[in-house]
């Protein structure tokens, strides 16, 4: 018999110590990695529930195992909420991650060797959109598109490439692009050659749910997202579609299970259901509006301090500092800011002279700091601290002074009160 008082601390002190240290790190560091966020205690309650014990291969009402009557309710709640939140008429909540969701789309609609058009990773795309180091870049013939000298998607060039290469699929979406994508224009280009338009909205799903960023669901054939990042739910994936194409929906379902996965993670799906309900609350819209305001406020400060921002600004939750003119690498900036308890990630910039392991840029995002209560005044101050560190990257006194300021504001604005 398992006793409920069993705990990690008494059984595995070494593991528990590392877990506790991570809690302290999250509370005492300012998190600016654009893909990270803090999920609610309700979501964590779902993920730590007895649902983790249940195997449920198949879909609600069509399982291969018995005893699924209650997890069917859980999954159907998640499906219905996802459809309502994003205006879709199809949703699959089973993908274990955004990458798994993307590969389910590829499996459903492509054959190895088919041509796809995806945003260049160095211009803000994602590994799973055809990067040569990713399986998507090995299985398919990839034609990359990028951004112009103003940092915007060049739709005219995209249309020309589409006409030249006749891809079977055009991929929209990004991991480090701060502009607004014209989904209708992308669909127009896809339709002109009879291609699928597939949009990976993982980075902006929360903003889209709140009406702060344009929704691709009415325009794309298929949309995927993660359920963490701006959506602030558990780590996982989601596939959406609209248009009533039942044949497409069957292909997508089969590509997830049994095509790419076995049993779904029911405790995570419960967490997704909770997060999707939270995203329907008025407070969530206010939060996402603040995420965008905070990103713009930070950009204003770094530009005033003489730093270059790719695209010249931001229209979402992130921006990319281009450090080429500062003779700094992204790796150096990442490390120095880390010593000041400010967590960012090094990131390639367009036409980056450095390798992906070094880079010439830093990606900065505001979902996590906004989640803990930062407003415009707070992030303006924070942006100034970032510039102070980057201006004096080898001055440990500056880094220590900044770290003290970080600890003070983190104590004032905790993640979990």
From Swiss-Prot:
Belongs to the SHMT family. InterPro entries: PyrdxlP-dep_Trfase, PyrdxlP-dep_Trfase_major, PyrdxlP-dep_Trfase_small, Ser_HO-MeTrfase, Ser_HO-MeTrfase-like, Ser_HO-MeTrfase_PLP_BS, SHMT-like_dom. The modification N6-(pyridoxal phosphate)lysine is found at residue 229. This is Serine hydroxymethyltransferase. Pathway: One-carbon metabolism; tetrahydrofolate interconversion; Amino-acid biosynthesis; glycine biosynthesis; glycine from L-serine: step 1/1. Its EC number is 2.1.2.1. GO terms for biological process: glycine biosynthetic process from serine; tetrahydrofolate interconversion. Its main location: cytoplasm. Catalyzes the reversible interconversion of serine and glycine with tetrahydrofolate (THF) serving as the one-carbon carrier. This reaction serves as the major source of one-carbon groups required for the biosynthesis of purines, thymidylate, methionine, and other important biomolecules. Also exhibits THF-independent aldolase activity toward beta-hydroxyamino acids, producing glycine and aldehydes, via a retro-aldol mechanism. Homodimer. The gene is glyA. (6S)-5,6,7,8-tetrahydrofolate binds at residues 121, 125-127, 355-357. Signal peptide: none annotated. Keywords: Amino-acid biosynthesis, Cytoplasm, One-carbon metabolism, Pyridoxal phosphate, Transferase. GO terms for molecular function: glycine hydroxymethyltransferase activity; pyridoxal phosphate binding. The lineage of its organism: Bacteria, Pseudomonadati, Pseudomonadota, Gammaproteobacteria, Enterobacterales. It is found in: Cytoplasm.
């Amino acid at each position: 018999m398992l006793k409920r008082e069993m705990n990690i601390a008494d059984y595995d002190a070494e593991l528990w110590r590392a877990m506790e240290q991570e809690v302290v790190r999250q509370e005492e560091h300012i998190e600016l990695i654009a893909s990270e966020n803090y999920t609610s205690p309700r979501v964590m309650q779902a993920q730590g529930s007895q649902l983790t014990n249940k195997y449920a291969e198949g879909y609600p009402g069509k399982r291969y195992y018995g005893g699924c009557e209650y997890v069917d309710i859980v999954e159907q709640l998640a499906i219905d909420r996802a459809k309502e939140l994003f205006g879709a008429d199809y949703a699959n909540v089973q993908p274990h991650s955004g990458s798994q969701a993307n590969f389910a789309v590829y499996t459903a609609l492509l054959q190895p060797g088919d041509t796809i058009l995806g945003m260049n990773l160095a211009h803000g795309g994602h590994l799973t959109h055809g990067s040569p180091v990713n399986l998507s870049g090995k299985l398919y013939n990839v034609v990359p598109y990028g951004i112009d000298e103003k940092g915007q998607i060049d739709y005219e060039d995209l249309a020309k490439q589409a006409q030249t290469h006749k891809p079977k699929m055009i991929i929209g979406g990004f991991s480090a692009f701060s502009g607004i994508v014209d989904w209708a224009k992308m669909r127009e280009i896809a339709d002109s050659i009879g291609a699928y338009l597939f949009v990976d909205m993982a980075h902006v799903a929360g903003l889209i749910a709140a009406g702060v960023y344009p929704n691709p669901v009415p325009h794309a054939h298929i949309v995927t997202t993660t359920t963490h990042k701006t959506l602030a739910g558990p780590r996982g994936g989601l596939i959406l579609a609209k248009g009533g194409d039942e044949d497409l929906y069957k292909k997508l379902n089969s590509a997830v299970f049994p095509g790419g996965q076995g049993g779904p993670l029911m405790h995570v799906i419960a967490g997704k259901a909770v997060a999707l309900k939270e995203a329907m609350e008025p407070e969530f819209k206010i939060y996402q509006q603040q995420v965008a305001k905070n990103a713009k406020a930070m950009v204003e400060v770094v530009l005033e301090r003489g730093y270059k921002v790719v695209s010249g600004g931001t229209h979402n939750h992130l921006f990319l500092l281009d450090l080429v003119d500062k003779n700094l690498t992204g790796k150096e900036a990442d490390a120095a800011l880390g010593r000041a308890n400010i967590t960012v990630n090094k990131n390639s910039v367009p036409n980056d002279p450095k390798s992906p392991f070094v880079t010439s840029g830093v990606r900065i995002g505001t979902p996590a700091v906004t989640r803990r209560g930062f407003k415009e005044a707070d992030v303006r101050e924070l942006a100034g601290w970032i510039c102070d560190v980057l201006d004096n990257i080898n001055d440990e006194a500056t880094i220590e002074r900044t770290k003290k300021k970080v600890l003070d504001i983190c104590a004032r604005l905790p993640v979990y009160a």
